Each structure stands twice: as C-alpha cells, then as structure tokens.
UniProtKB/Swiss-Prot annotation:
Presence of keyword Repressor: yes
Assigned keywords, A-Z: Activator, ATP-binding, Cytoplasm, DNA-binding, Nitrogen fixation, Nucleotide-binding, Phosphoprotein, Repressor, Transcription, Transcription regulation, Two-component regulatory system
Domain annotation Response regulatory: ranges: 5-119
Predominant location category: cytoplasm
Protein name: DNA-binding transcriptional regulator NtrC
GO cellular component: cytoplasm
Lineage, broadest ranks: Bacteria, Pseudomonadati, Pseudomonadota, Alphaproteobacteria, Rhodospirillales
Keyword DNA-binding listed: yes
Residues the record lists as binding ATP: 169-176, 232-241
Range of residues in the leader sequence: none
Domain spans labelled Sigma-54 factor interaction: 141-369
Superkingdom as given in the UniProt entry: Bacteria
UniProt xrefs under PANTHER family: DNA-BINDING TRANSCRIPTIONAL REGULATOR NTRC, TRANSCRIPTIONAL REGULATORY PROTEIN
UniProt DNA-binding region: 451-470
Length: 481
C-alpha cells in the first residue's frame, strides 16, 4: 500500500490523535480537523486520497456532507465513524456513498484494515440513489451491542442489492423486523412487502397461496386467485418459517428461483416474476437437510446471504434500550408514563428471556398497563417473572456443577419431556451442535474475532474452524469483545 494523504474530521481530539499516530506509522500523511467546514475546504481544493469523518460535528452533520463531496469528487473514498450506533446511521452512510461505516468505540486494527481496503479498492464507488437520504428516523431495530452493530453493517451493505437473504434465529428475535428493514430501506422500498408464514397455512394450500390458482383447479376453487408471488411483484416476498415448507412446494420454489417464472396451480402459462426473496426460520435447516426434510439445492439458493439474529440473552446490554423503547411506545399509545429503577433493570438483564425480545415487550406492556406506580421496582419485576410459564423461567444451575453433569441433567430432562415417546432422529448431531456453537462463539469473542488464535485455543486446524463457523452460521465480529 503506497503512502496516501488521509483527511480526518472528528470533534474529539483524542480520536484525532490516535488516528494520526496509527496511520502515520504506516507512512501516510494525516491532516485532521474538528469541524466539517475545514474538511469541505480541503476536499474542494482537491486535497486528500481518503476521508475518515465523524457524523456529529459542531457545524454540520458528516452524513449531510457526503453527497456534496460525491458531487465534486465521486471517486474519493469516505469512511464514516459514529457513536450513534443505529441501523439508520449505517443505512444513511451506505446510501449516501460511504465506503464503510464503523461504530464507536471502534477497534483500531479494524479501522486500519478498512483504510487499507479503501485505498487498494479498484471497485468504483456505488452510485448514489436518487432518493438517498429519504429514510425516516423510526428505528426498526433496537440495540447497540457488538452483535447488533455487525448486523447493521451487513444490512446497510445489502440495501442497494437484490440478493436473496435468509434470516435465522430463535422465535421472538425480530426476524420479520429485519426483513421489513431490508425492504423499507432497500431499492424496492416503493414496491409491496408481502409476507407469508409457512407454519400458519395448511400444507395442502401452500402452493396455492404462493403461486395462486385457476378457477376449477381443485374442489372449492370457484374463482381465479392471485398468489403471493404475483402480489409481491416489484417488491419483496418474505417467506417466514421456510423450514416448515413441504417438499413439494420446495421443488416449485426452487424452479422459480432458478428460472424466474412460475405457473399457477391448474395453470399452464408461465408468469415472469420480479421479487426479492427474504426467508426466515427458527429451525436448523442443515439438520432438516440431513433428515431429508429440506432440499439442499434450495438451501443454497436461499442462503446467498445468511443473517443470524442473536437471542436476547446474548446481548443483554441492549435490554435497557429496549425497555425504554417499549415504555415510550406505551406512553405514545396513551398508557401512563413509567420508568424502571436500576435494581429492577439489573434483574431484567440477568433473566434468560426464552421468548427473546417479544417476551420482553409483552412484559413491559404489562408493567405499563397494570401497575399504578410511576417507578417500577424490583419487587414488581420479580413477581411478574415468577408468574411466567415454567418453560420460560430462568434455570438456576447447581453451584459447582461441572459441564458433564450439566449436560447429563439437561439430557435427562429432555428425554423425560418426551415421556413414552422418543426424540426425533439426529439427536447426536443436534446435541453436539448445541455445545459447539457457544464453545466456538465464545472462543472467537475471547480472541476478538481472530480466527488463527481461536483455532489455536480450540486445538483445531484453521480450515476446520472456518468450516464450522460456516456450517454453524456463527457471525464473527472482528476486534470486538
């Protein structure tokens, strides 16, 4: 990488100093400023090979400056940093032409890596959309944890594409919110968003629901009916709980993805389709493939870009933000204004949340509606959590219990839950997967996403670790712990 002139704009002197030292060690010339007007003057004078800019500065928002820079110097790469770690910030940075978005606090090694990629990239900067900056300020996703930051960055990169996305995650993690965000802030935002839940439709009607049917196609088909593909033309089709789709319908869906056309049930004329497919499931599709319940070729067609949503227990630092968000929603809907004291909030952060964000939202709505006190305390929260169903209660682990004993205890409970029946086939792989995922994920977290160090820690070959990361759909967040 040859030496370059890098322009840094940030009103935090400490950040300017750190970036100057780090980039100068690599041989670059670094010019820094604490305001947007000076940065604009340098750019207008033709200075700089790369820009690193903050969003909030005393005189102007850094995001608002990007379109002006792109008009006079379209080839200039821009890296955006921000402490406003929301999906909106990431999307606005991407749609206005930023090369990369980094949330604060950032990892210095990651920033240096992004700088190297920006200076060495031969790919022309993405064209600015005609309606850039139209995104509203309503936040479809809440959270500033490292796991959510990585998801925001992935989503921002996908907004200008039509790539097929499959979202995985436990029930209640917000899979449909992600699908709607991909639509609402993407290139098909002016088209329809059509959702269909495979688990909620009788198996024999799924093909008719998806592709429509002709009059007389089957008993009771007294009129022609349009399917979801036709309804979603020009927009996004969200296939929720794709793991519950029958094999016959999977075959027809695969043909649509391969050929870009379909026929209605009972019809013969091919119909061209123009939709973006976003799928979601709480099930393990690879296990379903091994069990012969899901087509492997369809899996690879759908999982062009896989996104795994973490359960709430893996991002408990987001609980206070979510609680405040739901309380604000309640007050906006006419319920009394409430707050939650710190001991109660700490208890909510310790809870396991088997129902994830949906369970937390329901709890907050109950607190807002059923209790008269303005400040909700620990006693109220404890009472509410105690009233949840047994399956939703946090499991207290016996003190000093070893891993082997804990696994044995959980497996005994698992077999006992089936009473006289037996669990479904493939139990060995399912149990190993449940152990492997947290083991590898936590090892990567401990090594700040460094796969070489994680492989050494685990005693695995680096290629073996990479394959397991891919097979287990583990998201690697580099430089964060």
């Amino acid at each position: 990488m040859s030496a370059a002139t890098i322009l840094v704009a940030d009103d935090d002197r400490a950040i300017r100093t750190v970036l100057t030292q780090a980039l100068a060690r690599l041989g670059h010339e670094v010019r820094t400023t604490g305001n947007a007007s000076t940065l604009w003057r340098w750019v207008a004078d033709g200075q700089g090979d790369l820009i690193i800019t903050d969003v909030v500065m005393p005189d102007e928002n850094g995001l608002d400056l990007i379109p002006r820079i792109k008009k006079i110097r379209p080839d200039l790469r821009i890296i955006v940093m921000s402490a406003q770690n929301t999906l909106i910030t990431a999307v606005k940075a991407a749609e206005r032409g930023a090369f990369e978005y980094l949330p604060k606090p950032f990892d210095l090694k990651e920033l240096v890596s992004v700088v190297e990629r920006a200076l060495n990239s031969n790919t022309p900067p993405a064209a600015l959309p005609a309606d850039a900056g139209e995104a509203d300020e309503q936040l479809p996703l809440i959270g500033r944890s490292p796991a959510m930051q990585e998801i925001y960055r992935v989503l921002a990169r996908l907004m200008g594409t039509d790539l097929t996305v499959t979202i995985t995650g436990e029930s209640g993690t917000g899979k449909e919110l992600v699908a709607r965000a991909l639509h609402d802030y993407g290139k098909r935002r002016n088209g329809p968003f059509v959702a269909i839940n495979m688990a909620a439709i009788p198996r024999e009607l799924i093909e008719s629901e998806l592709f429509g049917h002709e009059k007389g196609a089957f008993t009771g088909a007294t009129n022609r009916s349009t399917g979801r593909f036709e309804q979603a033309q020009g927009g996004t089709l969200f296939l929720d709980e794709i793991g519950d789709m029958p094999l016959e319908a999977q075959t027809r869906l695969l043909r649509v993805l391969q050929e870009g056309e379909y026929t209605t049930v009972g019809g013969r004329t091919p119909i061209k389709t123009d939709v973006r497919i976003v799928a979601a499931t709480h099930r393990d599709l690879r296990t379903l493939i091994r069990q012969g319940l899901f087509r492997e070729d369809l899996f690879y067609r759908l999982c062009v870009v896989p996104i795994r949503l973490p359960p709430l227990r893996e991002r408990t630092e987001d609980v206070p933000l979510l609680v405040r968000h739901f309380l604000n929603q309640c007050s906006a809907q006419g319920l009394p204004v409430k707050s939650i004291d710190q001991p109660a909030m700490d208890r909510l952060k310790r809870y396991r949340w088997p129902g994830n964000v949906r369970e937390l939202e329901n709890l907050v709505r109950r607190l807002a509606a059923l209790y008269s006190q303005e400040v909700i305390g620990l006693d109220v929260v404890e009472a509410e959590l105690a009233d949840t169903t047994p399956a939703a209660q946090p499991v207290e682990e016996p003190q000093g219990e070893g891993l082997s004993a804990a696994v044995e205890r959980h497996l005994k409970d698992y077999f006992a839950a089936h009473k006289d029946g037996m669990p479904s086939n493939g139990l060995y792989d399912r149990v190993l997967r449940e152990v492997e995922r947290p083991l590898i994920s936590l090892s990567l977290s401990a090594t700040r996403g460094n796969q070489i160090k994680a492989a050494q820690l685990l005693g695995l070959n680096r290629n073996t670790l990479r394959k397991k990361i891919r097979d287990l759909d583990i998201q690697v967040v580099r430089g964060l712990k």
